[in-house]
């Protein structure tokens, strides 16, 4: 097997990726480890993380600002797709992985690296997402996965890193595994591994508890153009600004917490806690606007597409041909999704209280009203019902005779 000399490592500054640096050098004989730190709006001191990579033995550490790309190319398409895995999880973490993988491959090309590496364990979903994306974009590149191969527990990984002078970012008494980006936070491990234990309040950072959220409700209007959110409360905003503002508005009122049992790609069930206030709010508003601007059969079929889209992204097939085809269908439905949705935020709830589309609404008050302005032709109903139920009536008559 050809000796790997230069590796690009996806680096977060956490236990697993920090330990990967000396491990790659010692166990694989790698001479150069170049780390890539993705800025996804997580709010961390990325320069400090970059320096930690260098102190841990990296020959070079690159920080990439991916925030705009993350929102425009990944989060916004997910909003158009009303993406909710298992009808709950808006893929806040899953959406980030193909973007990071794309940049790993690009950097590997630029610096003529032999391989790319990541610190995902063998039990999680992210290993699948990284590997599938890297194989799709750089099928010639070798993928090295130290954390999947060394089979160390978190405690053992911390001890291994300490031998090489690598400080652990979490103590052995604080076992939570937390992933953060602009779209939200995911929390797992520790006490959360017991599905009957309530998630402690101190694990949440983006959302208020019901007790601490405002007693007075707040109404917000979200504006859409071609299925993309473009403003909040009559204020035009950039995509990143929209996510940030939606996070603050929804999070303040305690909306956006998810506590679920999740079906992982590797075949096990896991208990996951998510905070995704802004993304959930925007998806809820978008779905509501579609109800007034899309035909019933389009809404119905798009629901099937949305479920499959969410599954594909969750399972790591962002760069797959089926996902591309579903993107084309979803995009074709969104030219009519223009308008605004009014939502009341209060004590963990986001309640739709209004929706309108000036030029694309399929709702006609003169047809729906029961007042004297009603223009619906009631006399046509009897014939319609007769034809609509014809097959069922014939079936009933036949089966009635059979029983006799």
Curated annotation (Swiss-Prot):
On whether Cell inner membrane is a keyword of this UniProt record, the answer is no
Q: What is this protein called?
A: Argininosuccinate synthase
For ATP, which residues are the binding ones? 10-18, 38, 119
Give GO terms: molecular function aspect only.
Answer: argininosuccinate synthase activity; ATP binding
Q: Where in the cell is it found?
A: Cytoplasm
- Could you tell me which InterPro entries the record lists for this protein? Arginosuc_syn_C (IPR048268), Arginosuc_syn_N (IPR048267), Arginosuc_synth (IPR001518), Arginosuc_synth_CS (IPR018223), Arginosuc_synth_type_1_subfam (IPR023434), AS_cat/multimer_dom_body (IPR024074), Rossmann-like_a/b/a_fold (IPR014729)
Q: Which family does it belong to?
A: Belongs to the argininosuccinate synthase family. Type 1 subfamily.
User: Binding positions for L-aspartate?
Assistant: 121, 125-126
Q: Which residues bind L-citrulline?
A: 89, 125, 129, 177, 186, 262, 274
Q: Which gene encodes it?
A: argG
- What's one GO BP annotation on this UniProt entry? urea cycle
Supply the source organism for this entry.
Prochlorococcus marinus (strain MIT 9301)
**Which NCBIfam families does this entry report, sorted A to Z?**
argG, PRK00509.1
Q: Which domain of life is it from?
A: Bacteria
Q: What is its EC number?
A: 6.3.4.5
Keyword line: Amino-acid biosynthesis, Arginine biosynthesis, ATP-binding, Cytoplasm, Ligase, Nucleotide-binding
């Amino acid at each position: 097997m050809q000796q790997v000399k230069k590796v690009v490592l996806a680096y977060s500054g956490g236990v697993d990726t920090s330990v990967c640096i000396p491990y790659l050098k010692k166990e694989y004989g790698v001479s150069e480890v170049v780390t890539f730190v993705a800025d996804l709006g997580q709010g961390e001191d990325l320069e400090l993380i970059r320096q930690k990579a260098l102190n841990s033995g990296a020959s070079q550490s690159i920080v990439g600002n991916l925030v705009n790309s993350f929102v425009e190319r990944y989060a916004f398409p997910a909003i158009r797709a009303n993406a909710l895995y298992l009808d709950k999880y808006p893929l806040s973490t899953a959406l980030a992985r193909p973007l990071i993988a794309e940049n790993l491959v690009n950097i590997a090309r630029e610096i003529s690296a032999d391989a790319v590496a990541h610190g995902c364990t063998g039990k999680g979903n992210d290993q699948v997402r990284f590997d599938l994306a890297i194989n799709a974009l750089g099928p010639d590149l070798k993928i090295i996965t130290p954390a999947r191969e060394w089979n160390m527990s978190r405690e053992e990984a911390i001890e291994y890193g300490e031998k090489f002078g690598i400080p652990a970012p979490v103590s052995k008494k604080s076992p939570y595994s937390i992933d953060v980006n602009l779209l939200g936070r995911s929390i797992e491990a520790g006490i959360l591994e017991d599905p009957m234990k309530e998630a402690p309040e101190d694990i949440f950072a983006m959302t208020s508890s019901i007790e601490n959220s405002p007693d007075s409700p707040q109404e917000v209007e979200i504006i859409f153009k071609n299925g993309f959110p473009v403003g909040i409360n009559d204020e035009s905003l950039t995509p990143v600004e929209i996510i940030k503002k939606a996070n603050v508005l929804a999070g303040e009122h305690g909306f956006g917490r998810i506590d679920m049992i999740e079906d992982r790609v590797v075949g096990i069930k896991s208990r996951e806690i998510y905070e995704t206030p802004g993304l959930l709010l925007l998806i809820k508003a978008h779905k509501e606007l579609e109800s007034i601007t899309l035909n019933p059969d389009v809404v119905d079929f798009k629901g099937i597409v949305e479920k499959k889209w969410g599954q594909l992204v969750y399972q790591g097939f962002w760069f797959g041909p089926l996902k591309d085809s579903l993107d084309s269908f979803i995009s074709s439905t969104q030219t009519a999704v223009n308008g605004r949705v009014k939502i009341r935020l209060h004590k963990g709830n986001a309640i739709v209280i209004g929706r309108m589309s000036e030029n694309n609404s399929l709702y006609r008050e003169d047809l729906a009203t029961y007042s004297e302005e009603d223009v619906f032709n009631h006399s046509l109903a009897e014939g319609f019902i007769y034809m609509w139920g014809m097959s069922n009536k014939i079936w009933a008559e036949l089966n009635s005779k059979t029983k006799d």
